[in-house]
Amino acid sequence: MSLPGLDLTQPSAEREFAPAPPSQITLSAGSEWRFEVAFGTTVRVKLISGTAELFGTELAPSQTYTFCGTKSAIYTWHGCELEVGAGDAISALEATGMNGAATAQGFGAGGCQSEYTAEETPMVEYANVHFALETMRQEAKATGKDGPRVLILGPEDAGKTSLSKILTAYATKIGRQPIVVNLDPAEGMLSVPGTLTATAFRTMMDIEEGWGSSPMSGPSAVPVKLPLVYFYPMQNPLEGDGSVYRSIVSRLALSVMGRMAEDEDSRETGIIVDTPGVLSQSKAGSLEMINHIVTEFSITTILVIGSERLYSTMMKNYDNKPTSSASAVASDERISVVKLSKSGGCVDRDAAFMKHVRESQIRTYFFGNPIPSTASAALSVSASSTTNVTLSPHAQQLDFNSLGLYNYNITSTEEDEDEYDPAQFGASDAFLPGGANDAEQGASQQDENPSATPLPGIVSSIESAVPSGASNVPLKKLLPPAPSALANSLLAITHVPPTATPSEIRDSSIMGFLYVADVDSEKGKIRVLAPVGGRVPPRAIVWGKRWPGEVVGLVG
């Protein structure tokens, strides 16, 4: 009982968690609204009047867009008015899959964790870069040369991917078809983490999903993209002296250049290459890796964001130097280095947030997008108020002995040395003298007896079954029993047969991914989720043990 005139009663659950009414946000010309939304909650944004864009892609008037787990900014060139409100909460299944992600709504408009209006933005600089690239494209069309090949460099969380989206969106808006290359294995572009991808963009990008979506069996309001995917199951490009990453980059560049030679629109538009921030940290081998990328993609323009030191180094090494293009001598094609300002909206994304991003990308690959989207519903034939793309992966049990499963055997100081897996120890293992490991013992035995051959039916690693010229590829074939560490990890299916050489497996593009739900080491069976039905094709499979690593909670 409360005193008269004082409302001291306990608030009900409905009253406590009732969503706040939508807020009206007015932006003046040349300003942007920056917002952060936690995983597990959604925020709806509607353009009431004026014009606005998110990373270069225009918002449709009177359409409601739903955002979840993002840090973004909506910019306006001429002024606009936005309506921001709280969206529907994600179901308990998706929320538990976030593994402890922050799901509490913030105190900003619509439940944003953080939101504010900024008057100072680098959008004018970015627009000038777009116009300069467009001038180069017009010259390429007139002279028959290749279009600009742009490399974006900068430290972590400097806005490199955001700039890539802006330049791509502006190019597609005027009918161009740029090829976008993602060289950052930490985040997937139209794919899962741990991949290097290249995609030709002819149509608009998705406001809610960033780059958009790749082909799937469900409906899509925005035209899907067709990515070329290579698997690099490590977080750092410089792992193992960078030899694996360097080889995959070369193969990806060869495919991109082949596409440009056959596609006139892509050749005139050029390419945009997004890079990982670790290459800008002055670590051993980083400058050599940048030089490898510049050479392989015949880069003509280097954009440096948020690093004076890196900009100075790039100016000394590349500015006004001839490109590696075959036509550079005849056309006097030279490299330009440009410094760009870092946006004040760039915020640090901690390890916990990036883990949620990776888990969300993997979950979306197998189960679709759980976020209800009214924008997609408005473009669909049905009259439902909200819609979400729900996919149903196919579960099946595989015989481990029938799989050609490989793993990259690269030592790392960051790897957990205390990891213990009893399934890895079999009858052939022994306690080696002096603390030597299997690799050291095997190497010493080969030195003593180079002509020694393994026993029939026993292959210790893939290197012993291939010519010596390919033995430098650190791929090792997994032998029975099935390691229990396979559970809750990804498997990448390549396009080459299981008997392919290590270099062929490393350089092969990816057909699709499997998720290992359970491992039965005693019976030699593994239970997997596949995006399509039918038998798993007899192809070489690469284990993503180290990256993206273990993904717990994807299935019950």
Curated annotation (Swiss-Prot):
Tell me the residue numbers annotated for binding ATP. E32, K71, D157, A158, G159, K160, T161, S162
Q: For bias kind Polar residues, which ranges apply?
A: 442-452
* Alphabetized UniProt keyword annotations: ATP-binding, mRNA processing, Nucleotide-binding, Nucleus
The Gene Ontology biological process annotation of the record reads: mRNA 3'-end processing; tRNA splicing, via endonucleolytic cleavage and ligation
Q: Which GO terms describe its molecular function?
A: ATP binding; polynucleotide 5'-hydroxyl-kinase activity
Query: Where does it mainly reside?
Result: nucleus
Gene3D superfamilies attached here?
Clp1, DNA binding domain, P-loop containing nucleotide triphosphate hydrolases, Pre-mRNA cleavage complex subunit Clp1, C-terminal domain
Gene Ontology cellular component list: mRNA cleavage factor complex
Location comes to: Nucleus
- The answer to whether the entry has keyword ATP-binding is yes
Q: Where is this region: Disordered?
A: 1-21, 414-458
Q: Which family does it belong to?
A: Belongs to the Clp1 family. Clp1 subfamily.
Subunit text: Component of a pre-mRNA cleavage factor complex. Interacts directly with PCF11.
Function in brief: Required for endonucleolytic cleavage during polyadenylation-dependent pre-mRNA 3'-end formation.
Protein name from the UniProt record: mRNA cleavage and polyadenylation factor clp1
Question: To which species is this protein native?
Answer: Aspergillus terreus (strain NIH 2624 / FGSC A1156)
